[in-house]
């Protein structure tokens, strides 16, 4: 099932924002809800559409789209407690200040791609989970504020969490927040509606 079938409102919003003008897209996005996998899918799809060099279709096979589907695009980075750690970073339970510094250093140089940083939690088995005060601590979040507040063109930050309150208020205030229901919640809602009518 396509994202547009599962999440018509969100898909339409982001498709319209991206087709109108890339500048219409918020440069800091926060997805929240119970389904971290759906949030991650949305985040990678936004990254794919921002970097597609062809027709932006669901099955596009341009190099950028293939890289993003393979999670190997050089400008689309998942930032978690286990992903994209600098060599000298031995923290295993948090997104670290060293990762924040790595992002800042990466943004100093120009890129031919639209850079997307997806912040989430991921365990050793690859399971995606949302950010929370334990894995995305205030010190790290605060160290990112300047680059989120004054982002360069061609850079998007996406934060995934279960509850909005689990992310520092200063990140929330600089982000556009979207609730991503789990597909089970959507199915349940449709069943309730069909039961009434």
PLM feature spans:
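P-loop/Walker A NTP-binding region and its immediately flanking N-terminal helices
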Residues: 1-133, 156-158, 169, 190-195
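ATP/adenylate-binding site constellation spanning eukaryotic-like Ser/Thr protein kinases
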Residues: 73, 141, 164, 172
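Proline-centric
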Residues: 108, 151-152, 178-181
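A short beta-strand-to-loop transition that corresponds to the Sensor-1 phosphate-sensing loop
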Residues: 120-122, 159-164, 181-184
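Conserved Walker B catalytic segment
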Residues: 122-156, 163
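A short helix-turn-beta junction within AAA+ P-loop NTPase domains corresponding to the substrate/partner-engaging
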Residues: 169-185
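Long amphipathic alpha-helical scaffold regions
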Residues: 174, 178, 189-196
């Amino acid at each position: 099932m396509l994202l547009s079938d599962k999440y018509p409102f969100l898909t339409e919003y982001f498709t319209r924002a991206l087709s109108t003008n890339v500048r219409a897209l918020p440069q800091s996005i926060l997805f929240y809800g119970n389904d971290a996998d759906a949030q991650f899918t949305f985040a990678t799809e936004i990254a794919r559409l921002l970097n597609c060099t062809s027709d932006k279709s669901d099955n596009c096979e341009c190099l950028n789209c293939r890289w993003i589907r393979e999670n190997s695009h050089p400008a689309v980075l998942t930032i978690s407690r286990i992903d994209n750690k600098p060599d000298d970073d031995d923290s295993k339970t948090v997104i670290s200040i060293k990762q924040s510094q790595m992002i800042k250093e990466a943004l100093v140089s120009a890129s031919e791609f639209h850079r997307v940083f997806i912040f989430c939690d991921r365990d050793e088995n690859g399971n995606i989970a949302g950010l929370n005060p334990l894995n995305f601590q205030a010190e790290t979040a605060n160290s990112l504020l300047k680059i989120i507040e004054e982002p360069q063109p061609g850079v998007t930050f996406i934060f995934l969490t279960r509850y909005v309150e689990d992310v520092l208020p200063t990140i929330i205030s600089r982000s556009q927040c979207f609730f991503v229901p789990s597909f089970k919640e959507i199915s349940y809602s449709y069943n309730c509606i069909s039961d009434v009518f």
